[in-house]
Amino acid sequence: MAIGPGLHIDDPSNESLNLAMSDGARPLYDAVVDFIATEVEPVTLEFHRLGAVRDDHWGYHPGQLDILEKLKAKAREKGLWNFFLPDAETGEGLSNLDYAYIAAELGKNPIASESLNCSAPDTGNMEVLERVGTPEQKKQWL
């Protein structure tokens, strides 16, 4: 992919501008893409249908919350949880570049990032907990 005159992000000879996803991130990326396709996409229309009939336009319909909680449980069970955290103990140890590829996939579906515990403001709060939280707080919240 060209990003300017003579600059290609996937050109292996240009190490200073290598913006390709690392080989180590590929399995997680593939798992996220698969999860979105098989778990998130099939319930997205229902999620939006429920949102259109909610009483509180500042909150979620109870059915929407149920959909999200079920997706979150499945994601956590598959290990697709907190992978945006750079620390390999609490996250996947991804670089910002590798996470960018995954975030791009999350951005294609309006409920994907929430389903995989990667949406604001939660991500920022978890980053703080990762850095300064007690072991007990990390165990409970991360």
Task: List the predicted regions and their residue ranges.
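Amphipathic, small/basic residue-rich leader segments at the start of a protein or domain
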Residues: 1-119, 131, 136-140
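Short, conserved phosphate-binding/catalytic loop or strand-edge motifs used
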Residues: 119-126
